[in-house]
């Protein structure tokens, strides 16, 4: 009986005794920066708001979005996401930078040497890389470089991005272990490298066949000037769109890669929350990922307009 009473009290505390529609409205109210709350000291401490004006026993306030507390740990979801998100963003950024550094030059050289051995090699590798899921790449890299070749590479199969320094002036402080970023970034970047290589190659071959490129050749422009000044800026439009889309998609791929390497980021946090039915953490992670997708797509449109002057006109 005491357990039933405690369960009822907990349901009331979490608002689970209300109808589902009411729960949704209160959750949206908690998320909104401009919201309606009771002017009670406990509410002020909970929501950390700034009061605008009062409406009886209620007040309209400005506050940061309140993502509630974890069912499992009791900590604020915003604090948990605040520790996990930077690690995942760093991982996704490292993967997409690696993809750009490898994919764009490889696509350019493959297009300039069409039907050569380099072109065939680039097409074969990109097709193979695109067909491999991120978690398969992660397992293979962990097995080969983190296990079998560990003595030569010094890389770990499983390792957190941060840890305590064991020597030096920052002894005992939390520091970034950069070598633990390498394998997850490579595993996450395999498919973006493949798609960027294919898109760059196709776009460059299309641009190089345009009339204005033939005119540039007829005027005696050097091959380097023609490629880097005239062809490449126009060929980068679809590549920029792909990069922006893949950056957001890498957050989803990170869910699998982080668990393979025990990388304590957003993906690992979300998977653990799903396994433990920690709904507030799952909702917070989903909302953040959705916001990133929207923000990245807006940024892609801006970059597309900057690169392609025709769009600006």
Question: What are these model-derived regions, one by one?
Answer:
Residues 142-146:
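Transmembrane alpha-helix termini and helix-breaking/packing motifs in multi-pass membrane transporters
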Residues 5, 19, 23-26, 62, ...:
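Generic alpha-helical secondary structure signal
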Residues 16-101:
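An internal, D/E-rich "acidic patch" concept
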Residues 1-19, 78-83, 100, 109, ...:
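N-terminal signal-anchor/first transmembrane alpha helix
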Residues 85-90, 94-118, 134, 147-150, ...:
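Alpha-helical transmembrane segments of integral membrane proteins
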Residues 1-29, 39-46, 149-174:
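Hydrophobic alpha-helical transmembrane segments of membrane transport/permease proteins
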């Amino acid at each position: 009986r005491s357990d039933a009473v405690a369960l009822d009290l907990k349901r009331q505390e979490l608002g689970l005794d209300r109808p589902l529609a009411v729960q949704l409205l209160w959750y949206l109210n908690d998320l909104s920066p401009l919201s309606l709350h009771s002017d009670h000291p406990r509410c002020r401490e909970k929501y950390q708001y700034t009061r605008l004006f009062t409406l009886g026993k209620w007040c309209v306030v400005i506050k940061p979005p309140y993502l509630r507390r974890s069912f499992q740990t009791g900590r604020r979801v915003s604090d948990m996401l605040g520790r996990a998100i930077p690690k995942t963003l760093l991982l996704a950024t490292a993967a997409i930078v690696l993809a750009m550094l490898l994919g764009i030059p490889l696509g350019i050289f493959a297009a300039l040497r069409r039907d050569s051995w380099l072109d065939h090699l680039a097409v074969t590798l990109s097709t193979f890389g695109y067909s491999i899921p991120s978690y398969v790449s992660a397992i293979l890299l962990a097995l080969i470089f983190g296990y079998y070749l560990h003595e030569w590479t010094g890389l770990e199969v499983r390792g957190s991005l941060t840890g305590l320094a064991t020597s030096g002036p920052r002894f005992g402080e939390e520091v970034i272990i950069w070598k633990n970023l390498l394998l997850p970034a490579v595993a996450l970047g395999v498919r973006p490298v493949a798609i960027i290589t294919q898109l760059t190659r196709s776009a460059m071959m299309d641009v190089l066949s345009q009339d204005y490129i033939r005119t540039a050749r007829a005027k005696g422009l050097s091959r380097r000037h023609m490629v880097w000044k005239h062809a490449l800026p126009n060929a980068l439009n679809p590549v920029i769109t792909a990069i922006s889309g893949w950056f957001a998609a890498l957050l989803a791929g990170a869910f699998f890669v982080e668990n393979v390497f025990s990388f304590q980021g957003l993906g690992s946090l979300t998977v653990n929350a799903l396994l433990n039915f920690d709904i507030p953490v799952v909702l917070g992670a989903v909302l953040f990922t959705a916001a990133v997708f929207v923000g990245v797509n807006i940024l892609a449109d801006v970059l597309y307009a900057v690169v392609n002057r025709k769009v600006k006109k």
